[in-house]
Amino acid sequence: MDRIAITGGAQLNGIIPVSGAKNSAIKLMAASLLTDQPLRLTNMPRLADTKFLGKLLTRLGAQVDEREGLDGSETVLHAAEITSGFAPYDLVRQMRASFNVLGPLIARTGQAKVSLPGGCTIGARPVDLHLQALEALGAKIDLHEGYVYAQAPRGLKGAEITFPFVSVGATEHAMLAAVLADGVTHIHNAACEPELLDLQICLNAMGAKVEGAGTPTITITGVAKLHGATHSVIPDRIEMGTYAVAAAMAGGEVQLTRARPELIDSLLVKLEEAGAGVVRTEDGVIIKRDGTRLNAVDVETQPYPGFATDLQAQFMALMTTAKGESRIRETIFENRFMHAPELMRLGADISVSGGEAIVRGVDRLEGAEVMATDLRASVSLVIAGLVARGETTVSRIYHLDRGFERLEEKLGACGAQVRRIKGDAEGGPDHD
């Protein structure tokens, strides 16, 4: 398996262009199943996860054409005919979000057989809410031997859907299914993440009638048919936040371009509170820090627009060398401090109890061999390695390749001493 080696001590100075959002791109790709006309997605990230979903869409009958356009990478998806409604375990297990093809398949063809996603390394993330939403829309759902058998021979019907708790994936899934339902659907207690607004913009460009994405109530008036469209994927706020933290950690001055800093306001406020310089620009944000040591600050993960759980691991890495004691509370997912023991291998002083971690800043981290446990944890180890004395080697970096496009290249262009060490072919475990 490949590894990444980081030699600590170099400041970061330069420009990093932010890629399109992975968490938006994979749902937009699933939306291509809703029409028999081409959907052209620009500002597309080139990641392992988008490749996994492309393979699944191809299995279902879609044509997936990746190309380079004037605005960077783009993907054209054309599901002129759904030749199969079967999404097998060997593909769905590779990425949980691929389960979201279920709704579009039912909406367009009236039937589907989709594997349950399987296990997840970040605690319990059941798909019960997804299935309940589809049942509310009139789908008949049966579970048998690890597969979801879904039917709606007379089509889906508009419905009132109220989620008992906020779920980004379930909200997106309900939107994808309801756009072709007969009648009006109201989604209550909907997730408010910006990726949902991005999905709404794309669906409406395809002829859907969706209102309210980004608020707790989404209204969808079903239409009989969708058409093709061109849509630019929203910038990746998690990648943006990750490089912002990396710049604050290593010191120097990094300009993030093709970015929307308002999407990570909750993080930028904490960086300023810790003592980093934050300058918002027309095209993004500049993060800078001189040799002054950062101050410890507390964070608590919350649904958007609160502090993102997907930035918690990165921020913990930042706090390992801050002055004082930081309390980090994780309220979104259980078992999401698996990066803490690996950071401790680098010399971090961290205590974990339930959903809270206490980070006591140390003067210096020491390079060591560490292992990535999931996507965000893996990049937190790279961030810590930027300041650790000596060399830090991160293994199991297939996690990184799922969510960060050209990470070594982007950091290296700013002066980081980071390189990929090629290994044997990677299988990798099931992905979340």
UniProtKB/Swiss-Prot annotation:
Name of protein: UDP-N-acetylglucosamine 1-carboxyvinyltransferase
EC number(s) on file: 2.5.1.7
Modified residues (2-(S-cysteinyl)pyruvic acid O-phosphothioketal): C120
GO molecular function: UDP-N-acetylglucosamine 1-carboxyvinyltransferase activity
Record family assignment: Belongs to the EPSP synthase family. MurA subfamily.
HAMAP family: MurA
Protein localization: Cytoplasm
Matching SUPFAM superfamilies: EPT/RTPC-like
GO terms, biological process: cell division; cell wall organization; peptidoglycan biosynthetic process; regulation of cell shape; UDP-N-acetylgalactosamine biosynthetic process
Residues reported to bind UDP-N-acetyl-alpha-D-glucosamine: R96, R125, P126, V127, D128, L129, D310, I332
Keyword Oxidoreductase: no
Cited InterPro entries: Enolpyruvate_Tfrase_dom (IPR001986), Enolpyruvate_Tfrase_sf (IPR036968), MurA_subfamily (IPR050068), RNA3'P_cycl/enolpyr_Trfase_a/b (IPR013792), UDP_GlcNAc_COvinyl_MurA (IPR005750)
Pathway: Cell wall biogenesis; peptidoglycan biosynthesis
Entry GO terms, CC: cytoplasm
PANTHER family: UDP-N-ACETYLGLUCOSAMINE 1-CARBOXYVINYLTRANSFERASE (PTHR43783:SF1)
